[in-house]
Amino acid sequence: MTIQTKEKFFYASGAVANGVKNDAFTFFLLFFYSNVIGLAPGLASLAIFIALLVDAFTDPIMGVISDRTNHRLGRRHPYFLLGIIPMGLSYFMLFSIQLSWDLSQQYLFLWMLTFTIFTRLGMTIFEVPHRSLGSEMSRSYTERTSIFAAREMFGWAGGLFNAFLAYTIFFKDTPEYIPGTQNPEPWIYYGMTGAVLMSISVLVTYFGTLKYRNTSSNDQISFDLKLIFSQIFIALKNKSFLIFFFGYLFIAVSWGLNSSLQIYMNTYFWEFKSIMIASFLGIYVLSTFSAFLLVPRLVLFLEKRSILLFAITLAALIPPIPIVLYLNDILPDSGSWNLFFALAPFIYVANTCLSSSAIVRESMLGDISDEVELESRIGQQGLMYASSSLIGKLNTGLGILVAGLALEFIGFPQGSEVLPNAHQIFSLAMVQGPFVAVLMIIPFGIFSFYKIDRQKHKNIMSQLEAR
């Protein structure tokens, strides 16, 4: 069955919720608690680590529960509505804390931990079934890529729109606060707006995809705790899934670290004003749209693994180049528009590659779920995409964790009153640039062992259809 454009739109619109959350957690959360509220980066990292432990347990369980659900609205859609309240309310509460409350480090830590966990839990309840639905809408090797290309584009669009609102409305530079992100007053309105955007996104995708609520290849509906763990064990025996999981995991650690430190780099290394940072969003929009157009066409004649490996290579090599050039006085002065335009091509290429790799990975996971179904005779799209949801959270969670530890290690000051010295800023650049590039070697090596190509997937589908 061919998927209509409007149906892809309604499905992909659900990714806006995760895009808003990812943008906030990746670029703003650590900065807000460390440099605005005054929580020690190490404690912020600990809160993220504990939340990740909860995710590691809830994500796969949510995947299996969704796979086994029997409901008049199908096995995915009931959870769309169930996730809205904890997701939206907890996200708002996370950014509603006020500097004027004068809380101790202990209470700041508990506040961040509590609402980080419940925001992620609400996202798990919605996101895992939503990703799984995308795989079930089509089993075509190429159309599946098109579906997830649209999903990736909407996810980036949600994050970029959230960032646009942040820099152009909430965190404008003022005489008292340059950059405006150091102003404690607008953060509660930033959180409120994000919560509303996330909720609208879920409702649109819920009503727009009800046509596919009964898309299922699985008749088994009962489940218990023993079944949940047996299904997880089946997935862990699949070599393709293990390659995907650990390859994506190291991409998440590497790029999550890069993204979590970006606001620090823009503020203290490049010394950009808020209007300049907001102007970069246009480049991100262009690069994301480029990936959306490019990848579905490339996959028509190239294997997904080849596209992914090439994208990983460029995403690793490009970002450190402007840092090295700037340190050698080859680029324009910090804080200038000339520097902005000099960095623009590097950001465009790197983000196009990053978006392309994400589109390909999501499409690959659908192929892997077909292979697991062939081997186990049980459809496990929910569990497969639970792993993707979990690693997506690791992208932000481990990124913040490692970034917080790195900031502690280099002695980066906390709070908005103390500025870092030259040595601390240089150390920040070395972590965010060259160190991240070295880390990206690991996922390249792992994904080079991925074996599902066009012909193998065709054989898998032939065997499934013959049953």
Where are these regions (language model features)?
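Membrane-embedded alpha-helical bundles of multi-pass transporters/translocases
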Residues: M1-R467
